[in-house]
């Protein structure tokens, strides 16, 4: 069975012979009103700078989706773990958007893999905040990443509202594509992800490929999956003046420049870009990002590699960039390279293309959706350095003249299909479907006391997909 796309009508065969007809569910979905949403992002704050620590595309997704939901008149509260004593309990980001910094465990010294021990404390903080409101304050809970999902289904049960979950990444997928030096995801995460998949009322994924992974690995119900592409801020990321951007970054007008943007860790494979560029005389590379995850073990490792390759004078290291500064980097370079071993979508690829900059990307995960091979960039199968050097060289050569202008225009046009407005439409469709299904489910329980006593999906299952 194919997963349902957000916006497609269909409510499942389970409504037959239980007192609630499919037409009833469709009507409940159409009538569903989303007024207030609780977003859960335990392990990383939407206010953190992408490219540092665990902050990346998910942070952008959570913040931008909240801002755009608020523009539709929906109140959004984002719950994240406080990581410093100076973090205020509540931050009003914009009209209709609050970030609640929940104290759960020590502020420092914990990484993502320590956080399962603090989920009870985090859940208590979330429930305590909700208790200050009138009953029924939130209409829906949307959890991001498996840690948040663990809190999400507890909140769902307490508040009697549906849970929508976005995994962003899956342990089994990451473990199947480990880079040298990367630590595998622990079994605890695999078990936790299975629990959340079983408990969530709806599952939102970035691509059809991710939906297939959820179905094959975690036996997710295809009828509960909605495909929602992330968006890009087309006001910030849009074509700009290359020479002006190069002047600001101290780059020569005529030189060929490649950029790597992201967290510096084995999973993102920045070393592949350096090794490939080392084979291309005269090509400069900009690396924008900070060490993260396994990369923290050797924070200067990439600079040392540049020295070993003899290209240190051709490499410019920049700290993680603000959105406006990142757009300037994209304007300045000839192409952006994304050689990740695993990538659920690849938001950087879309942001670069929105600026009219073509992309060379690994043909993994969601990148074949984010990049149109041969139109807005080039996809590379595998991580062979010679193949990457050839792909980068080929795109640099084709960028010259009229062909380059055509690809730049095609890149911007492709990226424009990933607007946050489209993403918000799809999110709301998924939310309404979740509310409709959830309401119908509660009516079934009222009409069928035996069904109300049936075990939870998770407790009824045997084994965990891996």
Swiss-Prot record:
1D-myo-inositol 3-phosphate binds at residues 43, 54-59, 112, 145, 169, 189. Keywords: Glycosyltransferase, Magnesium, Metal-binding, Transferase. GO terms for molecular function: acetylglucosaminyltransferase activity; D-inositol-3-phosphate glycosyltransferase activity; magnesium ion binding. It catalyses: 1D-myo-inositol 3-phosphate + UDP-N-acetyl-alpha-D-glucosamine = 1D-myo-inositol 2-acetamido-2-deoxy-alpha-D-glucopyranoside 3-phosphate + UDP + H(+). It comes from the Bacteria. Mg(2+) binds at residues 330-331, 333, 357. One of its GO terms (biological process) is mycothiol biosynthetic process. UDP-N-acetyl-alpha-D-glucosamine binds at residues 49-50, 57, 263, 268, 321, 343, 351. Belongs to the glycosyltransferase group 1 family. MshA subfamily. Homodimer. NCBIfam families: mycothiol_MshA. PANTHER family: D-INOSITOL 3-PHOSPHATE GLYCOSYLTRANSFERASE, GLYCOSYLTRANSFERASE. This is D-inositol 3-phosphate glycosyltransferase. It comes from Mycobacterium marinum (strain ATCC BAA-535 / M).
């Amino acid at each position: 069975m194919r997963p349902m796309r957000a916006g497609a009508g269909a409510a499942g065969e389970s409504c037959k012979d239980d007192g609630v007809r499919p037409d009833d569910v469709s009507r409940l979905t159409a009538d569903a009103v989303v007024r207030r949403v609780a977003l859960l992002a335990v392990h990383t704050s939407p206010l953190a700078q992408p490219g540092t620590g665990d902050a990346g595309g998910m942070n952008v997704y959570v913040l931008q989706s909240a801002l755009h939901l608020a523009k539709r008149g929906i109140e959004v509260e984002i719950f994240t773990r406080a990581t410093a004593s100076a973090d205020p309990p509540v931050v009003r980001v914009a009209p209709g958007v609050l970030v609640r910094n929940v104290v759960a465990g020590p502020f420092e010294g914990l990484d993502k893999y320590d956080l399962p021990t603090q989920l009870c404390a985090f859940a208590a903080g979330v429930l305590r905040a909700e208790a200050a409101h009138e009953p029924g304050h939130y209409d829906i809970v949307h959890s991001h990443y498996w840690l948040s999902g663990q809190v999400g289904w507890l909140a769902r049960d307490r508040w009697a509202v549906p849970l929508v979950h976005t995994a962003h990444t899956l342990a089994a997928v990451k473990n199947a594509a480990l880079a040298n030096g990367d630590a595998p995801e622990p079994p605890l995460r695999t078990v936790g992800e299975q629990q959340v998949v079983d408990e969530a009322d709806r599952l939102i994924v970035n691509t059809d490929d991710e939906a297939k992974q959820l179905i094959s690995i975690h036996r997710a119900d295809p009828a509960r999956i909605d495909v929602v592409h992330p968006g890009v801020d087309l006001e910030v990321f849009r074509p700009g003046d290359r020479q002006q951007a190069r002047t600001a970054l101290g780059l020569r007008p005529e030189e060929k420049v490649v950029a790597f943007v992201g967290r510096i860790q084995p999973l993102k494979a920045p070393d592949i870009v350096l090794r490939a560029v080392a084979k291309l005389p005269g090509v400069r590379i900009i690396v924008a990002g900070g060490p993260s995850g396994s990369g923290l073990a050797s924070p200067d490792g990439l600079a040392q590699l540049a020295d070993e390759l003899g290209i240190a004078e051709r490499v410019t290291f920049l700290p993680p960039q603000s959105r406006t500064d990142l757009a300037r980097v994209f304007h300045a370079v000839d192409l952006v390279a994304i050689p990740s071993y695993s990538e659920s979508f690849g938001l950087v690829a879309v942001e670069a293309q929105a600026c009219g900059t073509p992309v060379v990307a690994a043909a993994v995960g969601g990148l074949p959706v984010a990049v149109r091979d041969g139109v807005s960039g080039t996809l590379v199968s595998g991580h062979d350095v010679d193949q990457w050097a050839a792909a980068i060289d080929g795109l640099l050569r084709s960028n010259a003249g009229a062909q380059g202008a055509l690809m730049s225009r095609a890149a911007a046009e492709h990226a424009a299909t990933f607007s946050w407005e489209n993403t918000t439409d799809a999110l709301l469709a998924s939310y309404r479907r979740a509310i409709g299904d959830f309401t119908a489910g509660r009516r079934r329980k009222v009409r069928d006391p035996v069904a109300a006593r049936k075990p939870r999906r998770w407790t009824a299952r045997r084994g965990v997909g891996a």
